[in-house]
Curated annotation (Swiss-Prot):
<keyword id="KW-0488">Methylation</keyword>
<dbReference type="InterPro" id="IPR000644">
    <property type="entry name" value="CBS_dom"/>
</dbReference>
<dbReference type="Pfam" id="PF00571">
    <property type="entry name" value="CBS"/>
</dbReference>
<keyword id="KW-0677">Repeat</keyword>
<feature type="domain" description="CBS 2">
    <location>
        <begin position="91"/>
        <end position="156"/>
    </location>
</feature>
<dbReference type="InterPro" id="IPR046342">
    <property type="entry name" value="CBS_dom_sf"/>
</dbReference>
<dbReference type="InterPro" id="IPR051257">
    <property type="entry name" value="Diverse_CBS-Domain"/>
</dbReference>
<feature type="domain" description="CBS 1">
    <location>
        <begin position="28"/>
        <end position="87"/>
    </location>
</feature>
<keyword id="KW-0129">CBS domain</keyword>
<protein>
    <recommendedName>
        <fullName>Methylated protein MJ0556</fullName>
    </recommendedName>
</protein>
Length: 174
């Protein structure tokens, strides 16, 4: 294995370790999370999702405790035949979630591995004692994690190209 390949592998591993240090709380949205309640109809929520261009939202009780998650996927199953069903009847009752202190790589893996094909994860406080899920603290979008990963990959590629250019006769432009 060449010195260049070894260096690249070491740098990639180190970069992965660096990204694991980034916490969900550093990337999540916490103030303006669009939520719903279990009493609303799927028609109301469908209209709200279209208005805000989102594909899902946390379902919370009157104390802000997350009790489920509703996605366009669930809504579409019932929209034409039962538009006035309550969200609580069709929501995901045990959705994947993350916590503010979890690393972004783990949160990203949860989104990818979810059989619900989520592009966002609710961020909850699991120390909330009364419910299985916990109090909603925010939401993290796959798009934001991908942007962060992309920025880090570009930085790493520029570093590698610079290193390669300094150690070879051939110059690579980026």
């Amino acid at each position: 294995m060449s010195k260049f390949v070894k260096l690249h592998l070491v740098r990639t591993l180190n970069k992965y370790k660096e990204l694991q240090k980034i916490r969900v709380k550093d990337v999540m949205i916490s103030g303006d999370v669009i939520i719903t309640t279990p009493e609303k109809t799927i028609k109301e929520i469908f209209d709200e999702m279209i208005k805000h261009n989102i594909s899902g939202m946390p379902v919370v009780d009157d104390r802000g405790v997350m009790i489920g998650f509703i996605t366009l996927r669930e809504i579409r199953k019932y929209m034409t035949s039962h538009p006035y069903l309550n969200v609580g009847e069709v929501m995901l009752k045990n959705p994947p979630y993350t916590t503010a202190d979890e690393d972004i790589i783990t949160a990203f893996e949860k989104m990818i591995e979810s059989n619900k094909k989520l592009d966002q994860l609710p961020v909850i406080n699991t120390k909330y004692p009364e419910k299985i899920l916990g109090k909603l603290e925010g939401i993290i979008f796959m798009e934001d994690i991908i942007k962060l990963l992309y920025e880090n990959i570009i930085k790493e590629l520029k570093t590698l190209v610079s290193f390669y250019n300094h150690n070879t006769e051939i110059k690579i432009k980026y």
